[in-house]
Amino acid sequence: MTMQQPIPVPPPDETPAPQAEAAARVTPMMEQYLEIKAAHQGLLLFYRMGDFYELFFEDAEIASKTLGIVLTKRGKHQGADIPMCGVPVERAEDYLHRLISAGHRVAVCEQTEDPAAAKARGNKSVVRRGVVRLVTPGTLTEDTLLDARANNYLLAIARARSSTGGDRFGLAWIDISTAEFMVTECSGGELAATLARINPNEAIVTDALYNDNELGQTLRELPAVTPLTRDVFDGATAEKRLCDYFAVATMDGLAQLTRLEATAASAAVTYVDRTQVGRHPPLSPPAREASGATMAIDPATRANLELTRTLAGERRGSLLDAIDCTVTSAGSRLLAQRLAAPLTDAPAIARRLDAVGAFVADSAAREDIRSILRGAPDMSRALARLSVGRGGPRDLAGLRDGIIAADQVLARLGELDQPPQEIAAVMAALTRPSRELAAEFATALDEQLPLIKRDGGFVRQGYEPALDEARNLRDASRLVVASMQARYADDTGVKGLKIRHNNVLGYFVEVTAQHGDKLMSAPLNATFIHRQTLAGQIRFTTSELGEIEAKIANAGDRALGLELEIFERLCAKALEISDDLRAAAQGFALLDVATSLAKLAVDENYVRPEVDSSLGFAIEAGRHPVVEQALKRNGEPFIANACDLSPAPAQKSGQLWLLTGPNMAGKSTFLRQNALIALLAQIGSFVPATRARIGIIDRLFSRVGAADDLARGRSTFMVEMVETAAILNQAGERALVILDEIGRGTATFDGLSIAWAAIEHLHESNRCRTLFATHYHELTALSAKLPRMFNATVRVKEWQGNVVFLHEVLPGSADRSYGIQVAKLAGLPPAVITRAKSVLAKLEAQDRGQTARALADDLPLFAVPSRAAAEAAPPSEAELLMDAVKALHPDEMSPREALDALYALKAKLPKQ
């Protein structure tokens, strides 16, 4: 995580008045730089100087090191050389991307007046400059700075603390590159899972929250955190700031937000306003996400299941990579959103499954629509760039092509007999954009378009008569230059003479070095004026060439000015219907996800799951979606297995399966595949099985794999225990829990005891659907007294002293782990294997299993409290009062909240 310095309020466009003390010691240009930099501490300042952005002092040293560019110097300040480096304006986005990726933020300072205007104000006048944009990780819009397949979220976190203890958090997250705006409220216990789901690129918090020791570790999990002053998170002015941003009189037209949600939402739009400096990116009204609307998945579970990234940090090999058959960037982003937040509403899931099912059944429609979508642009991001003045001609063309594609998709969808509800909604969205706009854009825009509007040449010939006239004058002058070159070659006798052009010299005459002396000698030197000598060429100008260059420049400037006016006019028309265009873009994304999941289902032989509100969990012939694809690439089959955690006829809660078997037999794969099948079902996807029935899962927990956390001073075993504690403390009846090898990181009996107690707690207290894999075979004895516990094992076969893994899960329990056979396969020396067998034989003679069976008979269940626990004294009144005081954060409380807290504390005092 990168902890950032606060972003200051940007200065006005006009440079502040010079400071007298600085004026005596620095040049006017450096004086201007220092004043602008002082207003933007904590950011690297890109200071525009002609065709370069230049950086000075510490900024230059940081940029030079990060970008690998030359560090030089320019002038002196207080007797010391001023470090300086620069990047070309035309390559600025590439350098910005590298700086942002390295955790830096950048203030972009542009020239806000023409140099000629500065000169007219006086010889010593400096060109006015102002910061036009603050580039931060969460406020990017350019394609070159963004991952096309991922959202780029800015997250605002607001906290409220109660005198009775317990935190509540308001969260608002915005992607200004797509205009998405979401809000929710959660408890402190839900915060980590919610942050992991949103996966923001940048978070903004109050100074107090930034420095909070309790939340420090949670915040450190985020890529970048920026602290802001408390006024940005002022709940009293939150609704007014939101109304101002959306230009509405009241919040009635927006979502009904809680005070905390409104506080976070207003902080987010305030930060967007500050970073865009005068621009006002259009956003969708904040959509409120109800608590519990999505499956809660904590960060450890997301990592263990490798949902979007493998444990090595790669997309390839993740579940997202395995199921992503989308053909558009927007579709890929939507699929990632759904995978991050599986639904918990069965009817909503059914609507998604209906859409996928329609395209599973109609392969021709599926492939036709996918073919159209392949050429569809990313309209949401094109609109975002145009709205903040960073768009180009290709963005306008993208909107044109998007409207044309909408017509093509509508025509094909119209051939469906009975489109499902989700597809019907898409069809309605695709009818909204104006077809007249597409027609005008088609008339106005040329076939070949530049990336940057200032390059010109993007308006079609014949669209604007005044522009055609300016271009003809410019081009006619260029023909004069061509004829001039032929005449100069004849006059000088230098057949290789050329007239060329660059941005520094303008037009110039160029000859090889061997002919240079001829042009610099009489009588030709009266016509040809020397400009530049290079290694192999010498360059000249003439008064005639200077005159024609001025005519070309004037005509070219007029042509470019007219083109830019046309661009702004077309851009304004597009932004007038931005809501309609954005709705169509969302429709494309929905269609892309539905058709891609249908293709996945057909290609990989997936089936439609049954998802309901029961506690059922029955999967027949289930497969791991990622492992199966990997095996298929190698020409190997995947062994499917069933799993049924549904409540037995006489039971109300789901079952707990205890899975035993050797290493390498496939226990972890079996655990993960069932969790992934459930997750796929609840995002609205078909699943890898022959049949699947899933009762809604509200929380998914996974404790699989082993890794330490050296940064936090945690051993592998400690990490395991922390994650297990979270499961035992948070899992409810609707949760799905998968646990692998709990207790393996400590002494045998310690580990066995922990695993034993954990099973009892899951069975008696949590009462959730659970898969528990272990090498402690003694635990199988618990099935005799835990009615909802079921023993299962992974089948193996011994053959000629070796073990063959069959990867079949069957009822029963393993009597051994075959660890020595696995060690032999791994290549341990024969002497070690022989000795290990000898030691194992002696240990097995002690019959640990008999001891475990006796314990199972003698020990009471976990749910029965011990006498010591029953007789434990409750906390004293003084302790309760002290805990309540510790929970208070005065810096975050309004006067009214502080008064309420004081009364609440007084109420806790014993009555006199």
From Swiss-Prot:
Keywords for this entry?
A: ATP-binding, DNA damage, DNA repair, DNA-binding, Nucleotide-binding
List the residue ranges forming a coiled coil, or say none: none
Pfam family name, one: MutS_III
> Can you list the GO cellular component terms from the UniProt entry?
cytosol
Note the SS bond partners. Answer: none
SMART domains per record: MUTSac (SM00534), MUTSd (SM00533)
Q: Extract one GO BP annotation from the record.
A: mismatch repair
The entry lists its GO molecular-function terms as: ATP binding; ATP-dependent DNA damage sensor activity; damaged DNA binding; mismatched DNA binding
Cited InterPro entries: DNA_mismatch_repair_MutS, DNA_mismatch_repair_MutS-lik_N, DNA_mismatch_repair_MutS/MSH, DNA_mismatch_repair_MutS_C, DNA_mismatch_repair_MutS_clamp, DNA_mismatch_repair_MutS_core, DNA_mismatch_repair_MutS_N, DNA_mismatch_repair_MutS_sf
| Amino-acid positions noted as binding ATP in the UniProt annotation, renumbered to this chain | G661, P662, N663, M664, A665, G666, K667, S668
- Can you tell which superkingdom this protein's organism belongs to? Bacteria
Could you say which protein family the record assigns here? Belongs to the DNA mismatch repair MutS family.
| Record function comment | This protein is involved in the repair of mismatches in DNA. It is possible that it carries out the mismatch recognition step. This protein has a weak ATPase activity.
NCBIfam families from the entry? Answer: mutS1, PRK05399.1
Q: Protein name, please?
A: DNA mismatch repair protein MutS
- Provenance organism: Bradyrhizobium diazoefficiens (strain JCM 10833 / BCRC 13528 / IAM 13628 / NBRC 14792 / USDA 110)
Gene that encodes the chain: mutS
